[in-house]
Amino acid sequence: MQNSLLKPRIIEVEVLGAGHAKVVMEPFERGYGHTLGNALRRVLLSSMVGYAPTEVTIAGVVHEYSSLDGVQEDVVDLLLNLKGVVFKLHNRDDVTLTLKKEGEGAVLASDIELPHDVELVNPDHVIAHLTAGGKLDMQIKVEKGRGYVPGNVRRLSEDTNKTIGRIILDASFSPVRRVSYAVESARVEQRTDLDKLVINIETNGVITPEEAIRQSARVLVDQLNVFAALEGTEAPADAPSRAPAVDPILLRPVDDLELTVRSANCLKAENIYYIGDLIQRSENELLKTPNLGRKSLNEIKEVLASRGLTLGMKLENWPPAGLEK
């Protein structure tokens, strides 16, 4: 009779595209596929270190709802395009970059002036389009971080020296764009009740899918080491209770789900602004939404499933304090 737990002996990595891979690991004892798969997925989505633009100052712009002469996009669209630029910083936690461009044509990520220790993963990404006589002059602050940090959370009250025209951005630091897992049956000799774990992961190119899984595993091991060295301590009297932390992915706006314009507008008409708002709605509730049909509902369900979420989930302490609508 075997008393030791099986560990995966087969690990396969299938590259599906740039930054996209399927990782297969087997065999696991029954139940361990879901136990480890769900833990890795949550860590991959919330705890990977990445880089994102966090503050922008644009010459001639006072706030994000302004427009610029000679620039086809309004400032809101320009900032959305800027968030799509993938930065990678080497041996530093933040940097302020300059982008200056004049004359008709597209403004690309490669037009940003870079020091030697800053890299662009997608230099051909389009930020804006200039018309004849157009000009764009902006300062971009890029920081290192993890997860998703809404701009309103980053507006610190002690910051009294605010620069006029400084725009604070919602920052999505995570280099992991999508991750899902599935558990299939595996067999070893006469045992047929084993698990095979299949992880489908897509990154933005800052790290490879394999490295993302390695890093997430290290985070889990580091956290579990606390339990391995568990020693009881007496709790202080009258210790105040803390509200459970909210998963950062739930604080993201529904726009981050990249739904069709029709679906996104239907959700906003029902005051569904954040992913945390959306997952608490049931299918029947969404189908009662004007102009949102079965096709849009299926699209929403598929996008949520790719992030390990479903409709009809229950959340405590939602919405969290300070969340803007």
UniProtKB/Swiss-Prot annotation:
Its EC number is 2.7.7.6. One of its GO terms (cellular component) is cytoplasm. This is DNA-directed RNA polymerase subunit alpha. DNA-dependent RNA polymerase catalyzes the transcription of DNA into RNA using the four ribonucleoside triphosphates as substrates. Residues 1-231 are annotated as: Alpha N-terminal domain (alpha-NTD). GO terms for molecular function: DNA binding; DNA-directed RNA polymerase activity; protein dimerization activity. It comes from the Bacteria. Pfam families: RNA_pol_A_bac, RNA_pol_A_CTD, RNA_pol_L. Disulfide bonds: none annotated. The N-terminal domain is essential for RNAP assembly and basal transcription, whereas the C-terminal domain is involved in interaction with transcriptional regulators and with upstream promoter elements. Gene3D superfamilies: 5' to 3' exonuclease, C-terminal subdomain (1.10.150.20), DNA-directed RNA polymerase, insert domain (2.170.120.12), RNA polymerase, RBP11-like subunit (3.30.1360.10). The gene is rpoA. InterPro entries: DNA-dir_RNA_pol_insert (IPR011262), DNA-dir_RNA_pol_RpoA/D/Rpb3 (IPR011263), DNA-dir_RpoA (IPR011773), RBP11-like (IPR036603), RNAP_asu_C (IPR011260), RNApol_insert_sf (IPR036643). Residues 246-325 are annotated as: Alpha C-terminal domain (alpha-CTD). It is an enzyme of class 2 (transferase). The lineage of its organism: Bacteria, Pseudomonadati, Pseudomonadota, Betaproteobacteria, Burkholderiales.
